[in-house]
Amino acid sequence: LEYNQDNLTDDMWGYNRYTKQEVRIASAFFQNEWKNKQWSFLLGGRLDKHNMVDHVIFSPRANLRYNPTENMNLRASYSFGFRAPQAFDEDLHIENVGGTVSMIELAKDLTEEKSQSLSISGDLYHRWGDFQGNLLIEGFYTSLSDVFALRQIGERDGIIINERYNEKGAKVYGLTLEGKIAYRSLLQLQAGVTMQKAEYKQARAWSDDETVPMEKKMFRTPNTYGYFTLSYNPFVPMTIALSGTYTGSMMVEHKAGFIDKDIAVNTPDFFELNLKAGYDFNLYKGITMQVNAGVHNIFNAYQSDFDRGAKRDSGYIYGPGMPRSYFAGVKLSF
C-alpha cells in the first residue's frame, strides 16, 4: 500500500496566473513470481486512485524469462501505465515567442494519458580468457492513447495561451543494441544504440497558422541515438575516462518572431565527446582525495542557429547543453 500527497502553489502576479493544485494518490501493488533455474513468470498489478481522476486505474504487468543456457537470458514483458491530468513542471514555464509571452493551460476535459508497452529481449554473456563480454538486443513497442499534446488557442491580455489536451494516440517502436567488454580491471568499454520511430496516429496541427503543414512525427524524438563509455586504469590510482553521446537528426518547432513564419526544422545530428582523467591520493586512514580534469564536448558540437533579439523563440533550443568547456576538480572521500 502507498499514499502520496503533493501540494503546489505557483503565483505569477505579473501575468495574472495563479496555480493551486493538490494531488492525492492512494495505491495498492501486488505481484507473484513463479521461477526455477530455467524459467520464471511474474504477474502483477497496481491500483491507483488519483483525486483528479474519477475512477480507479488498474495497471497490469507481466514478465516471462527463459534461460536456454547459463549464459543466455530471453525475456518478454508487458506493462500498462498512465499519466494523470495534472500540472507538471513544464506547464509552469513561461516562454518568450516573438516578443510575446506564452503559457500553458490544461483543457477542462483533459483525461489521463494511457500507455501499453511490450518488449522482447535477449541477453548474452561470454568469457574469453581475461576478457568478458555482454550483448543485449531488445525490441520494444509502446502504444499511447489520449496522449498529451499542445495547441495554441489564442491570446489573453497579450499572452499566448497554449492548451494541453488529449490527442487520439501515438506509438513508439524500435530496437536497442547494447554491448560491454572488459579486460581484467584494466579496460572497460560499454556502448549502445537505439533506432526508433515515434509518431502520432494522425497528423496534427502544431501551429495556429493554417498554412503550416500538419506533422505526424513527434517533435524532439530522434530516430537514432547512442552512447559509449571507455574507462582505462593504467595503474591503480589513475583513471582515464572517454565518453560520447550521439543524437540523430530530429524535428523541432521554430515559432515566428525572429523568423517570418512557423516552421518545423530538421536539426543536424550531434556527437558529443568528453574526456576526464583523475588521480587518487590516499591521505590518511581511508580518506582519499581525487584530483581530476578534463574537457566536455571536445569537438564543440553545438547549435549554431539560435534566435536573437526581443522577438526570439526562447523554446528553439536543441542539441548538447553546452559548447566545448574545460573543468578541473577535487573530491574528498571518507
Model feature map: region roles:
Residues 1-4, 19-51, 55-61, 65, ...:
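Surface-exposed extracellular loop regions of Gram-negative outer-membrane beta-barrel proteins
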Residues 1-5, 43-47, 76-80, 89, ...:
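Transmembrane beta-barrel strands of outer-membrane/channel proteins
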Residues 20-26, 35, 56-58, 114-118, ...:
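Residues that define the transmembrane beta-barrel architecture of outer-membrane proteins
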Residues 32-36, 47, 66-67, 80, ...:
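Residue-level signature of outer-membrane beta-barrel architecture
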Residues 35-40, 139-143, 163-255:
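Gram-negative outer-membrane beta-barrel transporters
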Residues 38-41, 71-74, 128-133, 185-189, ...:
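Repeated loop/turn-to-beta-strand initiation elements of outer-membrane beta-barrel proteins
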Residues 67, 75, 109-165, 171-173, ...:
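Membrane-embedded beta-barrel scaffold of Gram-negative outer-membrane proteins
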Residues 247-255, 279-334:
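C-terminal beta-signal and adjacent terminal beta-strands/loops
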